[in-house]
């Protein structure tokens, strides 16, 4: 969090993705890290020089929760999807979906562009989470910020027990934009 950054006596600069390139160019020195919202991973990766580490909030959150390795494995399963496979896209909150919604519009579009496959989708939100997961080839879950740790671990355990790969939005998006490896470079233990 920004509070953690301040407590570490570091400097935090917050900008819109459209302001990133100009901000980086104006700094007297390179930042230690760029952290982005997953939805703009592609643009931020293009605007961030390769010698500056870059990751996303959802990847950091997954690392903090201790489940990043399994989510990375789940993201890599995207590349094994075939025509007709069913993907569950699950959100922990029940926000009002708008045009351009990440879960119901952007992720399916990115999956189609990345895989070239005709996939089918099921969407859940809030407390909804299917008991039977065998019908899915992949589960893509939000970061779970509105779910307590116990609920998120329960969902991951259900997927593991069913043998279904599970990933989160940020890790999946990084994989589909070809920047998963780059977004994980900040973690020496992966």
Which residues are covered by each model-predicted region?
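P-loop NTP-binding site
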Residues: 1-190
């Amino acid at each position: 969090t920004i509070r953690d950054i301040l407590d570490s006596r570091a400097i935090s600069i917050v900008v819109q993705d459209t302001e990133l390139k100009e901000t980086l160019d104006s700094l007297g020195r390179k930042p230690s890290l760029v952290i982005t919202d997953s939805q703009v991973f592609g643009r931020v990766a293009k605007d961030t020089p390769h010698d500056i580490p870059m990751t996303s909030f959802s990847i950091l959150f997954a690392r903090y929760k201790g489940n990043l390795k399994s989510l990375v494995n789940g993201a890599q399963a995207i590349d094994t999807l075939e025509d007709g496979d069913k993907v569950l896209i699950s959100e922990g909150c029940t926000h009002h979906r708008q045009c351009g919604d990440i879960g119901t519009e952007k992720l399916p579009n990115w999956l189609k562009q990345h895989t070239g496959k005709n996939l089918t989708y099921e969407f859940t939100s809030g407390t909804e989470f299917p008991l039977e997961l065998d019908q899915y080839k992949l589960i893509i879950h939000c970061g779970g910020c509105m779910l307590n740790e116990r609920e998120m671990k329960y969902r991951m355990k259900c997927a593991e027990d069913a043998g279904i790969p599970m990933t989160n939005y940020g890790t999946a998006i990084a994989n589909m934009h070809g920047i998963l490896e780059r977004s994980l470079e900040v973690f020496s233990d992966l």
